[in-house]
């Protein structure tokens, strides 16, 4: 692991909301007196009925219950739109950048208010009210944000399904939450290609009971020719012409559900993660402000899709609650060229940029040229999200993208946590490439061993969280028992994250990957992230993924999939060189037993590597790869199978 330390630059400290001393003071207050701390910070949002109870939480076996600000009433849309109208009605709320670089628009807070009210009225006219579930299956267009906020305005519960999911996956999610209404688009656009969203919705509905979905609202994105079912389907623009742009907001209880978001479980059955209104918005807005050192007037861009939790918390709810200008991007980092991210930053003078390590690594493969031909002078803070960022990618991001003048906030959190839990703060935290560093306010990480014993000091183990924070998920939709079983049964009175971590002598946390991404080689535990970091540090390697496979002698062997930089050739000589490289870097125990050169890795459309598929291929067992509907490029898998290194079966 990297032991390089980057001190807080004077320029970061001088402009930051919080310095190191202030962080320590606030953190101490947040864990020693959470009621007082969150009682104060709960006032950062507006309440129609002020709360008097701050925290009412229990992680006790058989009695897991999480409530924050429970006697208060508020509305998320009021906080994200209406309260800003008097002071910043004409400020841009959303910059929308289309898949095609010639397509973009600015939406002010006043326009956002009108659009959200219009959408809410369209929903209300179709019987949607407080507590009803609405499924959104949309591309990254402004209507996705309008639909989220329209549901919130009415007290309805949105359940977004990422536009890359298959009709089967969509159907199971519509059924899971019992949505009577679906909002979609005729087609999506990604990297110049059309995505058949409406056709997928039609296929999904065919798999459901006839009387479940009553209405499908279709946003016209491409104007593509799609089938419309009379009496069920309506084009949004036609429905919107029939309603006004004024709609009262429903005050709801702090613990009223805001959204359900399905996330994959280790059993393969997706879990409906439930986030509620008050605590979630307090936490999303507070983390957005302090983690990104957000100042009034900053242009902020998170490259995620609203189909994932990062898009919920850090494209829509957190930024808009703070009156920010947030950028929504429909496209991909490599279309029409590898410079797209950096061109968008220059075009819109982006100050804060938040993306995933997988995007950074894929762009690294194309070299510095596409970055260096742009200015990027507006950038002030860089962020990373979605998986641990290996030190080499961190260094490239810092040096090449940020010209060594922007702090990187390497954020660790989960769908279940609602917001960022472990992260540097730009003006307060010395940085170590590859480390998520220190906990955010109110977050108490603990390290435990396999037996559940709490570990002190520098150590390696399983990462748990002691005590609740306002953004925490409340339950699994319709299955509270599964919630308790998944997160609270492994270690008593602790929230188990499912991730392994290392804590160093400075108290910094290094996330080593999912606990199921740990390989046991000859009785030694080896985090796959560590081996991957070592491989990616080699100058010829762009990306690597490491999994275990059954080994006659060691129990598990190490199987590495390696994607080389453009122009490099995968030879036997290079294979040996890479094995020696890892051996020297980490030690003989970490040497890959099998190494396969791969032109690409199987990824979901959100950029996550599908390790389950890699494990199956490494085990020479690819007859049942399971659900591959979320794969961005299915052809990648065929190549991996054809060139697999283990043919033992």
From Swiss-Prot:
One BP term from GO: acetyl-CoA biosynthetic process from acetate
Post-translational modification: Acetylated. Deacetylation by the SIR2-homolog deacetylase activates the enzyme.
InterPro entries: Ac_CoA_lig (IPR011904), ACAS_N (IPR032387), AMP-bd_C (IPR025110), AMP-bd_C_sf (IPR045851), AMP-binding_CS (IPR020845), AMP-dep_synth/lig_dom (IPR000873), ANL_N_sf (IPR042099)
Enzyme Commission numbers on file: 6.2.1.1
UniProt keyword Magnesium, yes or no: yes
HAMAP family: Ac_CoA_synth
Matching NCBIfam families: Ac_CoA_lig_AcsA, PRK00174.1
Name the UniProt record assigns to this protein: Acetyl-coenzyme A synthetase
Organism: Methylorubrum extorquens (strain PA1) (Methylobacterium extorquens)
Gene: acsA
């Amino acid at each position: 692991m990297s032991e390089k330390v980057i001190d807080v630059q004077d320029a970061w400290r001088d402009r930051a909301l919080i310095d190191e001393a202030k962080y320590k003071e606030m953190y101490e207050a947040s864990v020693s007196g959470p009621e007082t701390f969150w009682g104060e910070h709960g006032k950062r949002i507006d309440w129609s009925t002020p709360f008097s109870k701050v925290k009412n939480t229990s992680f006790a076996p058989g009695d897991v219950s999480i409530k924050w600000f429970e006697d208060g009433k508020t509305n998320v849309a009021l906080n994200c739109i209406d309260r800003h109208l008097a002071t910043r009605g004409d400020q841009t709320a959303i910059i929308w950048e289309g898949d095609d670089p010639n397509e973009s628009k600015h939406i002010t807070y006043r326009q956002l208010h009108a659009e959200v009210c219009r959408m809410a009225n369209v929903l209300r006219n179709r019987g949607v009210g407080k507590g009803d579930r609405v499924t959104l299956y949309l591309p990254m267009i402004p209507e996705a944000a309008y639909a989220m906020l329209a549901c919130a305005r009415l007290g309805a519960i949105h359940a977004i399904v990422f536009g890359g999911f298959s009709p089967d996956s969509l159907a199971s999610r519509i059924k899971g939450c019992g949505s009577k209404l679906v909002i979609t688009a005729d087609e999506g656009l990604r990297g110049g290609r059309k995505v058949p969203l409406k056709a997928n919705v039609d296929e999904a509905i065919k798999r459901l009971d006839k009387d479940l979905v009553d209405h499908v609202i279709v946003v016209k994105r491409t104007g593509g020719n799609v089938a419309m079912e009379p009496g069920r389907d309506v084009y949004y623009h036609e429905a919107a012409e029939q309603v006004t742009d004024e709609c009262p907001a429903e005050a709801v209880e702090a613990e009223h559900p805001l959204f359900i978001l399905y996330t994959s479980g280790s059993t393969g059955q997706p879990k409906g993660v439930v986030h509620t209104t008050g605590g979630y918005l307090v936490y999303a807005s507070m983390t957005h402000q302090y983690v990104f050192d957000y100042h009034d007037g900053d242009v902020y861009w998170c490259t995620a899709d609203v189909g994932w939790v990062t898009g919920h918390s850090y494209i829509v709810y957190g930024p808009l609650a703070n009156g920010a200008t947030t950028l929504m991007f429909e496209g991909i980092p490599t279309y029409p060229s590898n410079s797209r991210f950096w061109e968008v930053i220059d075009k819109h003078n982006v100050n804060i940029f938040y993306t995933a390590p997988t995007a950074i690594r894929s762009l690294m493969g194309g070299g510095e040229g596409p970055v260096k031909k742009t200015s990027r002078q507006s950038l002030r803070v860089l962020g990373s999200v979605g998986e641990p960022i290996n030190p080499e990618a961190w260094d490239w991001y810092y040096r090449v993208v940020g010209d060594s003048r922007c702090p990187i906030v390497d954020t660790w959190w989960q769908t279940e946590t609602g917001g960022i839990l472990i992260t540097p703060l730009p003006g307060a935290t010395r940085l170590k490439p590859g480390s998520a560093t220190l906990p955010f306010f109110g977050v108490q990480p603990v390290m435990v061993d396999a037996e559940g014993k709490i570990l002190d000091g520098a150590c390696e183990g399983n990462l748990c969280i002691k005590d609740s924070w306002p953004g925490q998920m409340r339950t699994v939709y319709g299955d509270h028992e599964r919630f308790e079983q998944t997160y609270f049964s492994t270690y008593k009175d602790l929230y188990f994250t499912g991730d392994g971590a290392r804590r160093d002598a400075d108290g910094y946390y290094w996330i080593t990957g999912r606990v199921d991404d740990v390989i046991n080689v000859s009785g030694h535990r080896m985090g796959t992230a560590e081996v991957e970091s070592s491989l990616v540090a080699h100058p010829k390697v762009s990306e690597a993924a490491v999994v275990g496979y059954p080994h006659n002698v060691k129990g598990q062997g190490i199987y590495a999939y390696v994607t080389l930089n453009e122009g490099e050739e995968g030879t036997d000589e290079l294979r040996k060189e890479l094995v020696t490289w890892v051996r020297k870097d980490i030690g003989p125990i970490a040497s890959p037993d099998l190494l396969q050169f791969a032109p690409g890795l199987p990824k979901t459309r959100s950029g996550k590597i599908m390790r389950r598929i890699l494990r199956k291929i490494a085990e020479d067992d690819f007859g049942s790869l399971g659900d591959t509907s979320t794969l961005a490029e299915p052809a990648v898998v065929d190549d991996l199978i054809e060139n697999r290194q283990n043919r033992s079966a």
